Amino acid sequence: MNQFKIHSPYKPTGDQPRAIKSISEGILKGEKFQTLLGVTGSGKTFTMANIIEKVQKPTLVLAHNKTLAAQLTSEFREFFPENCVEYFVSYYDYYQPEAYVPQTDTFIEKDASINDEIDKLRHSATSALFERNDVIVVASVSCIYGLGNPEEYKKLTVSLREGMEKDRDEIMRQLVDIQYERNEINFVRGTFRARGDVLDIFPASSTNIGIRVEFFGDEIDKIREFDVLTGNIISARKHALIFPASHFATSKDKLEIAIKKIEEELEDRVKVLTAEDKLLEAQRVRQRTNFDIEMMREVGYCSGIENYSRVLDGRAPGTPPKTLMDYFPDDFLLFIDESHVTLPQVKAMYGGDRSRKNNLVEYGFRLPCAYDNRPLKFDEFEGKLNQTVFVSATPAQYELEHSTNVAEQIIRPTGLLDPEIIVKPIKGQIDDLYASIKETIDKGFRVLVTTLTKKMSEDLTDYLKSMGIKTEYLHSSIDTIKRMEIIRDLRKGKFDVLVGINLLREGLDIPEVALVAILDADKEGFLRSETSLVQTIGRAARNSESKVIMYADNITKAMDKAISETNRRRKIQMEYNDKHGIVPRTVLKDIRDVIQTKVAEDEAEYKVNNNTDKLSKKEIEKLINKYEEEMKVAAKELQFERAAELRDEILKLKEQL
């Protein structure tokens, strides 16, 4: 049995030992929910790693976007080089779900670009969970979407052992059944090739290592790993387990049973639509479903096979899909990172998916079983939890109400204090900001400025550039990789000031930042809530000389709470430093290169419906209600740029009424 073992030159310090002991003991006692309330820069990831080492449980770490998941994965890999740390996120570089717009009679076909590297990492994660127990999977919220039945996935694996009597052609047939393709020329992931008594297999979870099976008659003589590029033998193996090339792979027997059920559901649906005098819809659903059935019979799958996953799994209507969480053993541990953002995301997933599916089913593009190809509802998600640790600097009400233990981690290992907060009047804020920026840059540090609107960000960026200050504007239409490049360039000193509406999304923990300026801090709303302000203040918590300037004419309730909490933490930190003779020191953090794998932007720029001139008054009112709901969800998830765009669109629509 492999054990989790941390490799790090550092030992837990400050509040870390107490937090590690408290939460580890709680887990071993069987406590279901706990919270790690750790301020920015207090080493929450290191604390999580130490807890994993203490409790020795397979662990799922849930992050609220792909970029944070990638950062956490690389950190955990540094801490656990001997153990298995996997990355599981949506494998789409681009994804346009199928949808139907009845107002314009427009059907939008599903269009997607799958990232082969991320697909490989997903297969690597699921296969690792069946092969070993020392596994950490860092995932985005895509892990609550249907993934295929883990029991079927395990049952379909092809087990090959040295000395086993097995016909080569029989193994090839088994590989085809689990979605592998024979390809003698282009040997890539999910393919195999046969040359005489040698069978080469390129596993779906592998990057550059293939499995070579050599036969002597009908007996497996040798199993060896080889480099698929050079052909060099790497090592000999006694046993190899080949997992399916698709998470939705199904045995032939099960597929035939599922097809019969799909045909029955099709007949029932056609009867319903015909009775409602929806003849076009009835013909459409019959034609589309029969085409899918034909494809499944011929090649074992079809485009959009996930829409039949409930039937393929043999689940009853309305029952939750199998997800990554079902691939874990029962006693797994879950960390929900930045839980104040991640949990609202989990809650919002089901509603958005359901509303899109309604039109597809209603207008005959899909059978009702498509409803069950969906993310988990929140209560279903809760039902799959074993033991959970919420991790956040600003845990929300849900986390605090459910937790039997809240471990505070306020003392930073570096001795750094929460930044000093200065409140200044709005009048003359730009001139004052310019002077503060100049002072900070002259010391060799960087500046973050957060504004309320896109226009203000653009105007401020132009103004600062005209004054000779190297400034960049970080906005929602910039994709993940570009955002990371901008952050890296800020750290390298290619520019000195970063302006934006939402500077929380990447967890911008940049040691070089010594000033965070919050413009119009007293304008109450989702952009200036207590959580948002505390998180923004935290951006200045990696530098010993940092400070925060809030420009405001009044102290709002949110400001008062954020300032009070920051001062409370600052007092505790100062007392600890005085007692132990610690001098605060700026974090020295390596500037890592951008992740090589190209990932899709989680929060792609939100596309609102600009073609509203032809809508009736009733349709406009309906659209306003829809946007208001989406704006609230976006605000809860701290996606402020998206929420601000929706707010602007709502105001435009109200003018049309």
Swiss-Prot record:
InterPro entries: Helicase/UvrB_N (IPR006935), Helicase_ATP-bd (IPR014001), Helicase_C-like (IPR001650), P-loop_NTPase (IPR027417), UVR_dom (IPR001943), UVR_dom_sf (IPR036876), UvrB (IPR004807), UvrB_inter (IPR041471)
Keyword hit for Cytoplasm: yes
GO-annotated biological processes: nucleotide-excision repair; SOS response
Coiled-coil regions listed in the entry: none
Domain (UVR): residue spans on this chain: 621-656
Pfam families according to UniProt: Helicase_C, ResIII, UVR, UvrB, UvrB_inter
CDD domains found in the cross-reference section: DEXHc_UvrB, SF2_C_UvrB
Motif interval(s): Beta-hairpin: 91-114
Residues that bind ATP: G38, V39, T40, G41, S42, G43, K44, T45
Gene Ontology molecular function: any one: helicase activity
Subcellular location: Cytoplasm
The protein's role, per its UniProt record: The UvrABC repair system catalyzes the recognition and processing of DNA lesions. A damage recognition complex composed of 2 UvrA and 2 UvrB subunits scans DNA for abnormalities. Upon binding of the UvrA(2)B(2) complex to a putative damaged site, the DNA wraps around one UvrB monomer. DNA wrap is dependent on ATP binding by UvrB and probably causes local melting of the DNA helix, facilitating insertion of UvrB beta-hairpin between the DNA strands. Then UvrB probes one DNA strand for the presence of a lesion.
Assembly: Forms a heterotetramer with UvrA during the search for lesions. Interacts with UvrC in an incision complex.
Protein name: UvrABC system protein B
Domains (record comment): The beta-hairpin motif is involved in DNA binding.
Family: Belongs to the UvrB family.
Positions of the Helicase ATP-binding domain: 25-178
Residues covered by the Helicase C-terminal domain: 429-595
One GO cellular component term: cytoplasm
Keywords, comma-separated and alphabetical: ATP-binding, Cytoplasm, DNA damage, DNA excision, DNA repair, Excision nuclease, Helicase, Hydrolase, Nucleotide-binding, SOS response
